[in-house]
Amino acid sequence: MKIAIIGSGIAGLTSAYLLNRQHDITLFEAADWVGGHTHTVDVTVAGQHYAIDTGFIVFNDWTYPNFIRLMQRLGVASKPTEMSFSVTDPDSGTEYNGNTLNSLFAQRSNLLSPRFWGMIRDILRFNKAVQKDLADGQIGAAVTLGEYLREQGYGQRFIDHYIVPMGAAIWSMPLADMLNFPLQFFVRFFRNHGLLSVTERPQWHVIMGGSSAYVAPLTASFAERIRLNCPVQRVDRHSDGVTIVSAAGSERFDQVIFACHSDQ
């Protein structure tokens, strides 16, 4: 078949990689580079080279089984890394890191702080209660994180110094917007990534040489089928296929794969 693929993120590139073996594929990319959220900046400091990932950074052995198999097939190496959460609030003077007990109480004054211990109690309560409430159908689709926290009486220290900054860091959102986040999605994401447990956590990994290191081997077999700077303007469906209207003109295909964000 003649297949059009729109978007060159991991979904589009993997689709092209697999389908190119038996089909005539064309990959359309609006930007002048491929890789989607994958973006590595190479930096040299004092003669030492660093590959800094500013987009896709890490993956884990719980939720990325297909990606791991793909990297193994491509021969792309990875290595284990740590994922920890730290908070520093100059206004309140609060500072901690959740990686170990020692780093949790890096500020020894927190050992005697009722508010800090209250935050820890709220963390344990939230981790248990929110999973039960979701399983019992007590969390409606329209319920936000902020509504739930207010209704259940969670402390301000837990809100300001744990759950809101953690969510904002994960989704790159302003702190003020995090309380309006849909709670159902929030809980499912946290549960799937081991963030609602203090003991059972997945092993995280990084691509050696930076995340962009997988792009070249992934695209090697169909590099000539990639069209950069070629945004798709319209897709018309027919009984026997589709018409793709892009910067390159109008073309017919048997199938189309939308490997892009829904608002694109």
What are these regions (language model features)?
Residues 41-67:
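N-terminal glycine-rich dinucleotide-binding loop that anchors FAD/FMN and/or NAD(P) in oxidoreductases
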Residues 6, 232, 251-263:
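Short hydrophobic core segments
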Residues 188-246:
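Helical element adjacent to the flavin cofactor pocket in flavoenzyme catalytic cores
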Residues 11, 33, 263:
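Conserved Rossmann-like nucleotide-cofactor binding loop
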Residues 20-44:
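Glycine-rich FAD pyrophosphate-binding loop
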Residues 26, 51, 79, 225-229:
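General small-molecule cofactor/ligand-binding pocket signal
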Residues 61, 65-183, 187-188:
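Mobile amphipathic helical/loop "lid" adjacent to a hydrophobic cofactor/ligand pocket
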Residues 2-27:
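N-terminal Rossmann-like FAD-binding beta1-loop-alpha1 element of flavoenzymes
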